[in-house]
Amino acid sequence: MCIRDSGRALDEPASNKIRWGMLINTNQCSDECDACVTACNEEHGIEDFGRPTTDTQWIRKLKLTNDASGETINVPMMCQHCENPPCVDVCPTGASFVRADGIVLVNKHTCIGCRYCMMSCPYKARSFVHENLENQLPHAPRGKGCVESCNLCVHKIDNGDNSTACSEACQKDGQQAILFGDLNDSESEISKQLKKYKTTEVRSDLGLNTAVRYRGI
């Protein structure tokens, strides 16, 4: 039997004892760096068709400006993997769902491309695949006419690599802005930092209990 780093067998279903999430330190996210975006695109075979309004974006970097001070910060924005996701509530086929470990996913076989989930997402984190897809990667199947979004590199997690392409690239590039880990493990680095620092849940007023939190906002 093969065992993951988390102690879970490779053929064992996801467990609600774990909740995967991210802590993003905007103070460490620089203007000139797009390592997270590039890594995500390469990991999942996401191509740039030169149509910025419709091209698939699993991560996009937003720039926020403080009107009073004029200070700007960079905010990597992706699916926030809500505990109570609106996208799941509005999906008519059940294609959008939350896995036991908190990862929000889309079943490409049952997605009908209605895009209700895109309209319901307060983070504008989902994309509709308009183009024919070529050279797809075996670990990251995608489909024209489907909606998709960040899946926290679920293929890596399910193969025992408890990391994401974006967090690895951010660490490698020296920015160290993105930290990935188990929110339910009090001894994990992400849990320790969440206790130590003031963090923000984007649109906390909606009561979605997101798995992605930010510092510096």
Model regions: which residues?
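Non-ligating segments of multi-cofactor redox enzymes
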Residues: 4-217
